[in-house]
């Protein structure tokens, strides 16, 4: 029986790397995964997912206006798929999360979502909150803070200072480097204190 999975973490924990590993394992066994990502995240270019260590794979980039259920149903009618893997789920909508549940329930295809639980303001992404409520299986992908504790928060650092206000969605791409901005995964204590190294 198919399930809806949510694998979440702070940034730099290896979510995309895990997605690529799962896709490889399916393909290595003669199965067909369908890899989807958000068109908002253009770090690897459109129609591609790429881990921070450089491994990449072709994918379909979807917008928040796309009906994922219809996309998967149409794709599956001509290319039998065994699993749907979604990177950057936090950039999708709650309606699309319900469409993913429909893929599991109506098409009996497992769906594995990878994404952030919270933004750099410490607030949950709406899609993450919904997935935490409705996913059949929740799995935390763990990483560590500079202090050695588990990192569960994302901190935006600009010109050496922690940022705690602004647009909740800022994509980590090359444009941030131009304004000396980066994201750092930290524990709750260091997120509250604004300490990132």
UniProtKB/Swiss-Prot annotation:
Q: Record-annotated residues binding ATP? A: 9-16, 87-90
Classify the source by domain of life.
Bacteria
Entries under InterPro entries matching the protein: P-loop_NTPase, Thymidine_kinase
Residues at which Zn(2+) binds: 145, 147, 187, 190
Catalyzed reactions: thymidine + ATP = dTMP + ADP + H(+)
For this entry, the protein name equals Thymidine kinase
Query: Which source organism does the UniProt entry give?
Result: Francisella tularensis subsp. tularensis (strain SCHU S4 / Schu 4)
Q: Gene of origin? A: tdk
The subcellular location is: Cytoplasm
Keyword Thylakoid carried by entry = no
Any GO CC annotation of this UniProt entry: cytosol
Q: What is its EC number?
A: 2.7.1.21
Active site residues of this protein: 88
Q: Which GO terms describe its biological process?
A: DNA biosynthetic process; thymidine metabolic process
Tell me the protein family, please: Belongs to the thymidine kinase family.
């Amino acid at each position: 029986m198919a399930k809806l999975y949510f694998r979440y973490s702070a940034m730099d924990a290896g979510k995309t790397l895990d997605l690529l590993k799962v896709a490889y394992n399916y393909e290595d066994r003669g199965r067909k995964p369908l890899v989807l990502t958000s068109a908002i995240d253009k770090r690897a270019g459109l129609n591609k997912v790429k881990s921070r260590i450089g491994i990449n794979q072709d994918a379909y980039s979807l917008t928040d206006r796309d009906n994922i259920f219809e996309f998967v149903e149409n794709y599956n009618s001509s290319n039998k798929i065994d699993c749907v893997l979604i990177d950057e789920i936090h950039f999708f909508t709650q309606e699309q999360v319900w469409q993913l549940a429909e893929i599991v329930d109506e098409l009996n295809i497992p769906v594995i979502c990878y994404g952030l639980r919270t933004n750099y303001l410490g607030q949950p992404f709406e899609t993450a909150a919904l997935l935490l409520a409705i996913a059949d299986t929740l799995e935390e992908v763990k990483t560590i803070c500079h202090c050695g504790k588990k990192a569960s928060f994302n901190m935006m650092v600009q010109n050496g200072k922690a940022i705690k206000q602004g647009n909740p969605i800022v994509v980590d791409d090359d444009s941030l480097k131009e304004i000396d901005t980066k994201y750092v995964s930290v524990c709750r204590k260091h997120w509250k204190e604004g300490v990132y190294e």
